[in-house]
């Protein structure tokens, strides 16, 4: 600290001292003790004259000084002056991604700071700085940077704090989304709106502007505009925003549901980009999962430009692309929606045929390079069969993973002399000593943060009627898989082959799928 304050010390020496302070402070928070306020004040005064990597280093050091517990002696005034200086640095260096990222880390730490009043003060000051920058009249790059920072602070701020800024944050966000063209800014703001809908739904949906226009009407205008824009706007952020709004608005959407469904399916019919397609399918699947009867009836009665019903168009695209969904939460929603669709099957879907299993190549044909590059040929099967295939496939996959987890748990609990070791030295297929081991470590670390204790597992499964808890269930992902497997098994057991469309669906299953269904 003395080196940093020395007027005749060289710049490299001062930077080395700052880096040492940062490293020590991150490792031992009590290192500087009562000097924290003085050091923070000194570093804060350096922010306006620092640039590039030097500014990043200073920001990282300031972040290390932010209190992590209530024993800190730092006053709210010191943290306020630091926040002001940081926000001023953002305004001057928003074009530098590294500086922008460091500033977001500091603001997130301030939002978690236990000093009384610091989180609320940080959120208010941040929104006062970012909200005016959401404009089409500002310099290029200002709006997307402000939108990204708003998303960052919204993600960390708790619901109580967000309620206090809805009245001036929502108008700024909505105003830009109704006229802005920057894709990056729009995607960040869609995520911000999704966070507001999840954390403070009553405040966001109960807001009215000066003309007494309800926020829901403004949100619907935003959705309408986004659906009319390029497909790259309608990515994952758009899907999360839609589902968050659908989940919180509920029956408030009933008057506009016909127009909303028509707009979503019309966009889906024209979509060519995978992100846009999967996003629209996810939003429609959510509505199908929670409002199946109304959604099926409305889509069946809606005719698109080509004369085809919206229900047929939606189901055709859905069954073709649903397997590309990789997120567990989204996959759960799709499986629930497919079960609901099967239970509300309509005559308009009886004559819909889609791609089934891949047809084998003829034995008598020589496989040339051009034939090898040709598209695979698929068996055409009824749509009802494809739905049943997807549900059986998901059940079989989940059941296999649960059985493997149970087997590992049983072996781990067995006495050492009874544990299987015959394959201790056997080679494993497709293992790369660099990539695969690192990926396995990454997966382990990812799951460790989601571990549940035995009581929580039992409680979560008992809530859905599962009394017999399988062994080896330790993570939230495992619990979700058990729930999904249980629901799929109940649904598949309830099928009655005497119902015409059910009988037709079962008749086109292959031998493996029929065996799986019979085992239930």
Listing of model-derived features with the role each one plays in the protein:
Residues 1-520:
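Karyopherin-beta/Importin-beta family HEAT-repeat alpha-solenoid scaffold
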């Amino acid at each position: 600290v003395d080196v940093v304050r020395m007027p005749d010390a060289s710049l490299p020496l001062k930077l080395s001292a700052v880096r040492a302070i940062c490293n020590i402070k991150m490792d031992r928070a009590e290192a500087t003790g009562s000097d924290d306020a003085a050091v923070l004040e000194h570093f804060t005064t350096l922010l306006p004259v620092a640039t590039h990597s030097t500014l990043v280093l200073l920001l990282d050091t300031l972040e290390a000084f932010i209190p992590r517990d209530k024993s800190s002696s730092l006053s709210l005034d010191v943290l306020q002056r630091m926040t002001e200086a940081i926000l001023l640095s953002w305004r001057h260096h928003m074009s530098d991604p590294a500086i922008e990222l460091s500033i977001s880390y500091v603001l997130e730490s301030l939002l978690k700071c236990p000093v009384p009043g610091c989180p609320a003060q940080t959120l208010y000051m941040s929104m006062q700085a970012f909200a005016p920058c959401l404009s089409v009249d500002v310099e290029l790059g200002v709006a997307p940077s402000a939108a990204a920072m708003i998303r960052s602070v919204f993600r960390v701020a708790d619901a109580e704090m967000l309620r206090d800024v809805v009245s001036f944050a929502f108008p700024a966000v909505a105003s830009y989304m109704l006229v802005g063209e920057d894709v990056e800014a729009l995607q960040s703001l869609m995520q911000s709106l999704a966070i507001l809908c999840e954390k403070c739904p009553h405040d966001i949906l109960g807001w009215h502007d000066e003309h007494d226009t309800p926020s829901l009407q403004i949100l619907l205008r935003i959705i309408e505009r986004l659906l009319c824009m390029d497909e790259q706007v309608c990515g994952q952020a758009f899907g999360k925003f839609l589902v968050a709004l659908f989940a919180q608005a509920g029956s408030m959407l009933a008057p506009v549901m016909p127009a909303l469904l028509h707009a979503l399916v019309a966009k889906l019919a024209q979509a060519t980009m995978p992100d846009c397609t999967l996003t629209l399918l996810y939003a429609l699947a959510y509505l199908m999962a929670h409002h199946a009867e109304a959604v099926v009836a409305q889509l069946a009665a809606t005719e698109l430009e080509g004369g085809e019903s919206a229900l047929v168009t939606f189901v055709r695209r859905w069954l073709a692309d649903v397997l590309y969904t990789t997120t567990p939460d989204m996959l759960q929603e799709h499986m629930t929606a497919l079960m609901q669709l099967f239970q509300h099957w309509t005559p308009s879907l009886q004559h819909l045929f889609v791609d089934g299993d891949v047809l084998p190549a003829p034995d008598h044909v020589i496989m040339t390079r051009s034939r090898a590059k040709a598209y695979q040929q698929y068996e055409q099967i009824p749509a009802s069969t494809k739905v049943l295939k997807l549900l059986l496939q998901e059940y079989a996959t989940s059941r296999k993973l649960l059985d493997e987890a149970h087997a590992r748990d049983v072996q781990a609990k067995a006495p050492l002399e009874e544990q299987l070791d015959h394959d201790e030295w056997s080679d494993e297929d497709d293992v790369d000593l660099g990539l695969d081991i690192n990926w396995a470590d990454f997966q382990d670390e990812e799951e460790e943060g989601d571990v549940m204790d035995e009581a929580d597992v039992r409680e979560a499964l008992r809530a859905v009627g599962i009394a017999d808890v399988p062994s080896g269930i330790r993570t939230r992902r495992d619990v979700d898989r058990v729930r999904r497997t249980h629901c799929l098994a109940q649904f598949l057991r309830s099928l009655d082959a005497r119902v015409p469309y059910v009988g037709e669906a079962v008749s086109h299953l292959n031998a493996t799928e029929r065996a799986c269904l019979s085992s239930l």
